[in-house]
């Protein structure tokens, strides 16, 4: 186990035999790069905040029928992925704390298996996040460029099948990760998926925003509801751009860590970067905290439902808000 309260995502055979999962290359560079120790309370606080926020998001989607649309179903899938990464990091933090302070005793083999479970949960979470973001992007694309056929294309049953397929694929990825945890190819595949997702999203967004203005002018003569749907689609695309930007900023250091761990594990500069792994985990958890804030900032309907849920739970009575909400 890592003495600074967190496991490395995959030690790839670099861990010591006494159960310490810190890479040898990181230890060799300790004189040059000091590992940034982060208090266990920070991980637990972020995990709790993220968990409560994302439960609120899912509750809002379930409660408000106006949010029963494909886009918000995909947002709900993204919220579940954020919850999963928060739960895994919090659970891992508690386990390491108990082991470090001798409140919990486990055999080395059990520690290794538990480490694989934590890593698998992170793997499932990142794959689910990428797939959910991609699904939202496709939904926004259809909303903007196929506005008149949107209801026929993106039905509730079809969006449910997409979400089911996403999580079945994620579960398969998590299973493969546990079975082949010693193989570097698993990490390479995860990195390739991340880069492929970025390429697909960049291509989709470039095409979407280049044509959006022209397409909006072209349908200006159509009935007002089509124009409203189109403007809503553009607003949703901007929201997705914000979600994607935060995702990249928060997850990129983690994936760079994986790339360096494979390509130059014994290089001192690479080891220096990898020695701050705990900070990259903090960034991942910050992503789970920021996403619900973006939903609330960008969606009046979501914001209104958040207030209703919080007020009802606090006072056990429905709240009434001004019509501007």
Swiss-Prot record:
GO biological process, one term: adenylate cyclase-activating G protein-coupled receptor signaling pathway
Keyword annotations: Cell membrane, G-protein coupled receptor, Glycoprotein, Lipoprotein, Membrane, Palmitate, Receptor, Transducer, Transmembrane, Transmembrane helix
Signal peptide feature range: none
InterPro entries noted in UniProt: GPCR_Rhodpsn, GPCR_Rhodpsn_7TM, MC3-5R, Melancort_rcpt_5, Melcrt_ACTH_rcpt
GO molecular function: melanocortin receptor activity
Keyword Ion transport in annotation: no
Glycan attachment residues as annotated in the record: 2, 15, 20, 28
Topological domains annotated Cytoplasmic: 62-73, 139-155, 212-239, 298-325
GO cellular component: cytoplasm; plasma membrane
SMART domains referenced in this protein's UniProt entry, alphabetically: 7TM_GPCR_Srsx
Transmembrane segments: 38-61, 74-97, 115-138, 156-179, 187-211, 240-265, 274-297
Lipid tethering residues (S-palmitoyl cysteine): 311
Keyword Ribosomal protein included in the entry's annotation: no
Membrane topology qualifier: Multi-pass membrane protein
Disulphide connectivity of cysteines: none
A Pfam family assignment: 7tm_1
Compartments reported by the entry: Cell membrane
Extracellular topological domain: 1-37, 98-114, 180-186, 266-273
PANTHER family per the UniProt record, alphabetical: G-PROTEIN COUPLED RECEPTOR
Described function: Receptor for MSH (alpha, beta and gamma) and ACTH. The activity of this receptor is mediated by G proteins which activate adenylate cyclase. This receptor is a possible mediator of the immunomodulation properties of melanocortins.
Family according to the record: Belongs to the G-protein coupled receptor 1 family.
Name of the protein in question: Melanocortin receptor 5
Organism: Bos taurus (Bovine)
């Amino acid at each position: 186990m890592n003495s600074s309260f967190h496991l490395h995502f995959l030690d790839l055979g670099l861990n010591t035999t006494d159960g310490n999962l810190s890479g040898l290359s990181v230890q060799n560079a300790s004189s040059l790069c000091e590992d940034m120790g982060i208090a266990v309370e920070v991980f637990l606080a972020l995990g709790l905040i993220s968990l409560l926020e994302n439960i609120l998001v899912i509750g809002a989607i379930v409660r408000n029928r106006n949010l029963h649309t494909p886009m918000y179903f995909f947002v709900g899938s993204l919220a579940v992925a954020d919850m999963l990464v928060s739960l895994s990091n919090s659970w891992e933090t508690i386990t390491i704390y108990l082991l470090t302070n001798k409140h919990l005793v486990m055999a080395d083999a059990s520690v290794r298996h538990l480490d694989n479970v934590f890593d698998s949960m992170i793997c499932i979470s990142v794959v689910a996040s990428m797939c959910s973001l991609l699904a939202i992007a496709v939904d926004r694309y259809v909303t903007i460029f196929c506005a008149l056929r949107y209801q026929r294309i993106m039905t509730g049953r079809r969006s449910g099948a997409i979400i089911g397929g996403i999580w079945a694929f994620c579960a398969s990825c998590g299973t493969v990760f546990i079975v082949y945890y010693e193989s570097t190819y698993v990490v390479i595949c995860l990195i390739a998926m991340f880069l492929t997702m970025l390429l697909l999203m960049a291509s989709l967004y470039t095409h979407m925003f280049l044509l959006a203005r022209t397409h909006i002018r072209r349908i200006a003569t159509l009935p007002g509801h089509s124009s409203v749907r189109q403007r809503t689609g553009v607003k949703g695309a901007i929201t997705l751009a914000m979600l994607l930007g935060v995702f990249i900023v928060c997850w990129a250091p983690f994936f760079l860590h994986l790339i360096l761990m494979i390509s130059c594990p014994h290089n001192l500069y690479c080891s220096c970067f990898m020695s701050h792994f705990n900070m990259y985990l903090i960034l991942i958890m910050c992503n789970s905290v920021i996403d619900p804030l973006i939903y609330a900032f960008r969606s009046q309907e979501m914001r209104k439902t958040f207030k209703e849920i919080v007020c009802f739970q606090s006072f056990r009575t429905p709240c009434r808000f001004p019509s501007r909400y």
